[in-house]
Amino acid sequence: MDLVNNLNDRLLFAVPKKGRLYEKAVELLKGSDIQFHRHNRLDIALSTNLPLALVFLPAADIPRFVGEGRVALGITGIDQVREAKMDVENALDLNFGSCKLQVQVPEKGPYTDPKQLIGKSIVTSFTSLAEEYFAELEGVPVKDITTNIKFVGGSVEAACALGVADGIIDLVESGETMRAAGLKPIATVLETSASLIVSKNPSHPELVQMIKSRIEGVLAANKYVLCNYNAPRDKLDALLKITPGRRAATVSPLDDEGWCAVSSMAEKKKIAQIMDELKKEGASDILVFSISNCRV
């Protein structure tokens, strides 16, 4: 198959090709019914049910491809968007890939405050963000900082042990890798997570909006459950405060005039507590249903 010629008239959607965001991104695409098959060693996959093509790229490159309009939309971390300094729309927080960009120093070293690193050597994969951070600490423009910012593409945590750096700035998820390298955090530069980003002038804007709507539906389905129960009318106001829904609960009359049926979306992580509170306030026949997908 000539993939290049088959890209004509297709929306291009950039996806991380590997790393911490890849698996969750692919799971999100499947939940949004974006069907595709990725051939071995190929970084382009044509959708079999929509006029789009997935382009698998390093997460760090995706903001530039989207910002320059080479692809219409993409999934990457906010840290990568900020580092690339590209003008894109952050369309959706995707609720995965959460981590922190932190200043880390040797556990047994003399540094306890990032200001102590001014004028020292810092190793990072995020040179732009590091320069901005130290420019603010030093109170000078980026071009005038005295801190020596060095770029490495990987294994940043080894820099201090190898004598290359006094401290590092790197992404930290659980912190286990940093602790294993004998490092400790002394400051957070940025909190980040995965985001759906969109070009300012995308091709196929209607298809972009449809994909965004589908992804919003998957995110809502993952976050919420449907809670149904019967409510005494004289307790309805109190019960609706417990289950207000995303916008409003659905209230339906029952044959018994003293009762009504309530249906409401509720946060999945809070549902046990919500059910306890409903029962305490007089609700009965409380049922909870999973939401496989939705549009919000």
UniProtKB/Swiss-Prot annotation:
Pathway: Amino-acid biosynthesis; L-histidine biosynthesis; L-histidine from 5-phospho-alpha-D-ribose 1-diphosphate: step 1/9. It catalyses: 1-(5-phospho-beta-D-ribosyl)-ATP + diphosphate = 5-phospho-alpha-D-ribose 1-diphosphate + ATP. Keywords: Amino-acid biosynthesis, ATP-binding, Cytoplasm, Glycosyltransferase, Histidine biosynthesis, Nucleotide-binding, Transferase. Pfam families: HisG, HisG_C. InterPro entries: ATP-PRT_HisG_long, ATP_PRibTrfase_cat, ATP_PRibTrfase_CS, ATP_PRibTrfase_HisG, HisG_C, N-reg_PII-like_a/b, N-reg_PII/ATP_PRibTrfase_C. It comes from the Eukaryota. GO terms for biological process: L-histidine biosynthetic process. PROSITE patterns: ATP_P_PHORIBOSYLTR. It is found in: Cytoplasm. One of its GO terms (molecular function) is ATP binding. Its main location: cytoplasm. It is an enzyme of class 2 (transferase). Catalyzes the condensation of ATP and 5-phosphoribose 1-diphosphate to form N'-(5'-phosphoribosyl)-ATP (PR-ATP). Has a crucial role in the pathway because the rate of histidine biosynthesis seems to be controlled primarily by regulation of the enzymatic activity. Belongs to the ATP phosphoribosyltransferase family. This is ATP phosphoribosyltransferase. It comes from Yarrowia lipolytica (strain CLIB 122 / E 150).
